[in-house]
């Protein structure tokens, strides 16, 4: 029976996921298939390359670096997180990514993305990070603060828009047992997002994005109900923070990140 790994997003809250995956590396825990959403896809890279501590360093080493993120990058490039630094300078030079180990890992990794034209989630293979880095970037491209990413003629944004917790996909993909890592605390339920009119205006050419945002809270909470049922059935094991934390999606406080 195949066991899958499902990683929720959460932007800088993903530092929690990085810590969980470091524990898995220490314990020698592997999974047949792994599904990463947004920051979860980023964390999945360092897990599959078996580089303990690397993703935590990526989250925390560049907090004061204006080349890493910020309004200047957003205004200059359309991306709050600087694409050149995040997806090229860091893995290729500043904090080298082990491409060879990643490529040899028998586990299959998938970056969850949202097709902004169809409004559907897609699960892009992460087979080779030299070729598939844009799949990870697309998965982590948050609305309003990121440009859509074009891959093979299709435009994508953050996978969390269409499938925040892809447990059902993991099950239908053959993983009857799954470990789910969430960045939201026990008891969390999503509420209707703010800035819906801004979303509607920004993505006027892609109305599916607005539809997804309008329905996101209800869809997310339905996924939580399904997850809870799978946990009760013994077919899913859930790891998440036990209590609320002060870490924001764009968090620059190193102490808060370390505490999480």
Where are the regions that the model predicts?
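Patatin-like phospholipase
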Residues: 1-37, 45-260
């Amino acid at each position: 029976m195949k066991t899958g790994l499902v990683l929720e997003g959460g932007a800088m809250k993903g530092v929690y996921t990085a810590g969980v995956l470091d524990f898995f590396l220490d314990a020698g825990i592997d999974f047949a298939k792994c599904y990463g959403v947004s920051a979860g896809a980023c964390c999945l890279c360092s897990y599959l390359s078996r580089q303990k501590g690397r993703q935590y360093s990526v989250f925390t080493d560049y907090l004061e670096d204006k080349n890493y993120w910020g309004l200047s990058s957003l205004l200059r490039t359309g991306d709050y997180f600087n694409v050149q630094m995040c997806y090229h300078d860091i893995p290729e030079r500043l904090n080298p990514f082990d491409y060879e180990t990643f490529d040899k890992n028998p586990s299959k990794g998938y970056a969850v993305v949202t097709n902004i034209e169809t409004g559907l989630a897609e699960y892009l293979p992460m087979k080779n990070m030299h070729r598939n880095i844009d799949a990870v970037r697309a998965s982590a491209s948050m609305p309003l603060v990121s440009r859509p990413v074009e891959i093979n003629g299709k435009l994508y944004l953050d996978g969390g828009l269409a499938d925040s917790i892809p447990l059902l996909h993991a099950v239908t993909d053959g993983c009857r047992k799954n470990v789910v890592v969430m960045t939201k605390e026990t008891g969390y339920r999503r509420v209707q997002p703010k800035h819906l009119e801004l979303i509607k205006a920004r993505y006027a050419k892609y109305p599916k994005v607005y539809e997804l945002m309008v329905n996101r809270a209800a869809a997310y909470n339905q996924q939580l109900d399904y997850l809870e049922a799978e946990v009760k059935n013994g077919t899913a094991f859930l790891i998440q923070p036990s209590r609320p934390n002060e870490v924001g999606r764009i968090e620059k406080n190193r102490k808060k990140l370390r505490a999480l």
